[in-house]
Amino acid sequence: MRIKYYNHHLHSSYIILNSNLYGVPHKDLILAALVASGHRKSSEIPKEDIQKFASVLTPEDLDAVRKLSVILQIAESFDRSQSSVVTGIDCDVLGDSVIVKTQAEGDCSLEIKDALNASSEFKAAYGKNLEIL
Protein backbone atom coordinates (compact mmCIF):
# COMPACT_ATOMS: atom_id res chain seq x y z
CA MET A 1 0.00 0.00 0.00
CA ARG A 2 1.30 3.47 -0.86
CA ILE A 3 0.40 6.43 1.26
CA LYS A 4 0.53 9.80 -0.43
CA TYR A 5 0.88 12.87 1.75
CA TYR A 6 -1.85 14.66 -0.18
CA ASN A 7 -4.37 11.99 0.78
CA HIS A 8 -3.40 11.75 4.42
CA HIS A 9 -6.92 12.71 5.50
CA LEU A 10 -8.31 9.58 3.82
CA HIS A 11 -5.54 7.37 5.19
CA SER A 12 -6.12 8.75 8.68
CA SER A 13 -9.81 7.97 8.40
CA TYR A 14 -9.07 4.41 7.27
CA ILE A 15 -6.61 3.83 10.11
CA ILE A 16 -9.05 5.15 12.72
CA LEU A 17 -11.87 2.95 11.43
CA ASN A 18 -9.73 -0.16 11.16
CA SER A 19 -7.71 0.06 14.34
CA ASN A 20 -8.99 -1.98 17.23
CA LEU A 21 -9.09 0.72 19.86
CA TYR A 22 -10.51 -1.19 22.78
CA GLY A 23 -12.86 0.74 25.00
CA VAL A 24 -13.77 3.33 22.36
CA PRO A 25 -17.39 2.99 21.24
CA HIS A 26 -17.84 2.24 17.55
CA LYS A 27 -19.82 5.45 16.99
CA ASP A 28 -16.96 7.51 18.44
CA LEU A 29 -14.53 5.82 16.04
CA ILE A 30 -16.84 6.67 13.14
CA LEU A 31 -17.07 10.30 14.25
CA ALA A 32 -13.28 10.58 14.66
CA ALA A 33 -12.74 9.02 11.23
CA LEU A 34 -15.20 11.46 9.64
CA VAL A 35 -13.44 14.41 11.29
CA ALA A 36 -10.14 13.18 9.87
CA SER A 37 -11.55 12.65 6.38
CA GLY A 38 -13.30 16.02 6.32
CA HIS A 39 -10.54 18.30 7.56
CA ARG A 40 -8.80 19.05 4.26
CA LYS A 41 -9.16 22.46 2.66
CA SER A 42 -12.40 22.77 0.70
CA SER A 43 -13.07 19.16 1.59
CA GLU A 44 -16.39 17.95 2.77
CA ILE A 45 -17.11 14.70 4.47
CA PRO A 46 -17.24 12.13 1.68
CA LYS A 47 -20.90 11.45 0.87
CA GLU A 48 -20.26 7.72 0.61
CA ASP A 49 -19.01 7.75 4.22
CA ILE A 50 -22.12 9.58 5.38
CA GLN A 51 -24.34 7.09 3.54
CA LYS A 52 -22.36 4.14 4.87
CA PHE A 53 -22.89 5.23 8.47
CA ALA A 54 -26.29 6.94 8.11
CA SER A 55 -27.97 4.44 10.41
CA VAL A 56 -25.90 5.56 13.42
CA LEU A 57 -25.37 9.26 12.67
CA THR A 58 -27.70 12.06 13.67
CA PRO A 59 -27.81 15.56 12.16
CA GLU A 60 -26.19 16.75 15.40
CA ASP A 61 -23.34 14.28 14.88
CA LEU A 62 -22.73 15.60 11.36
CA ASP A 63 -22.76 19.18 12.64
CA ALA A 64 -20.19 18.28 15.30
CA VAL A 65 -18.03 16.54 12.69
CA ARG A 66 -18.15 19.63 10.47
CA LYS A 67 -17.17 21.91 13.35
CA LEU A 68 -14.36 19.66 14.54
CA SER A 69 -13.08 19.20 10.99
CA VAL A 70 -12.61 22.97 10.70
CA ILE A 71 -10.78 23.08 14.03
CA LEU A 72 -8.50 20.24 12.90
CA GLN A 73 -7.82 22.05 9.62
CA ILE A 74 -6.81 25.19 11.51
CA ALA A 75 -4.69 23.21 13.99
CA GLU A 76 -2.86 21.51 11.15
CA SER A 77 -2.23 24.91 9.56
CA PHE A 78 -0.53 26.09 12.73
CA ASP A 79 2.33 23.73 11.88
CA ARG A 80 2.32 24.38 8.12
CA SER A 81 6.10 24.87 7.98
CA GLN A 82 6.57 21.74 10.12
CA SER A 83 8.93 23.65 12.38
CA SER A 84 6.69 23.98 15.47
CA VAL A 85 6.90 27.76 15.29
CA VAL A 86 3.42 28.21 16.83
CA THR A 87 3.75 27.14 20.45
CA GLY A 88 0.28 28.04 21.70
CA ILE A 89 -2.89 29.99 21.09
CA ASP A 90 -5.41 32.03 23.06
CA CYS A 91 -8.96 32.49 21.82
CA ASP A 92 -11.49 35.20 22.59
CA VAL A 93 -15.06 35.44 21.33
CA LEU A 94 -15.99 39.07 20.75
CA GLY A 95 -19.36 39.71 19.16
CA ASP A 96 -19.49 38.02 15.79
CA SER A 97 -15.77 37.17 15.74
CA VAL A 98 -13.44 34.61 17.22
CA ILE A 99 -10.00 36.13 17.70
CA VAL A 100 -7.12 33.67 17.85
CA LYS A 101 -3.85 35.06 19.21
CA THR A 102 -0.86 32.94 18.32
CA GLN A 103 2.12 32.42 20.59
CA ALA A 104 5.15 31.76 18.44
CA GLU A 105 8.87 31.32 18.49
CA GLY A 106 9.71 33.06 15.23
CA ASP A 107 7.81 34.18 12.16
CA CYS A 108 4.46 32.41 11.91
CA SER A 109 3.04 34.37 8.96
CA LEU A 110 2.90 31.21 6.80
CA GLU A 111 0.90 29.41 9.47
CA ILE A 112 -1.50 32.32 9.96
CA LYS A 113 -2.04 32.71 6.22
CA ASP A 114 -2.72 29.00 5.83
CA ALA A 115 -5.09 28.92 8.83
CA LEU A 116 -7.04 31.88 7.46
CA ASN A 117 -7.84 29.77 4.39
CA ALA A 118 -10.39 28.07 6.65
CA SER A 119 -12.24 31.34 7.33
CA SER A 120 -15.23 30.58 5.14
CA GLU A 121 -15.59 27.04 6.51
CA PHE A 122 -15.26 28.44 10.04
CA LYS A 123 -17.98 31.02 9.36
CA ALA A 124 -20.26 28.34 7.90
CA ALA A 125 -19.70 25.99 10.85
CA TYR A 126 -19.78 28.47 13.73
CA GLY A 127 -21.52 31.56 12.36
CA LYS A 128 -18.56 33.69 13.46
CA ASN A 129 -15.73 35.45 11.66
CA LEU A 130 -12.24 34.07 12.22
CA GLU A 131 -9.43 36.50 13.00
CA ILE A 132 -5.91 35.26 13.65
CA LEU A 133 -3.16 37.45 15.06
Language model features with spans:
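Residue-level detector of family-conserved "landmark" positions at structurally sensitive sites
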Residues: 26, 132-133
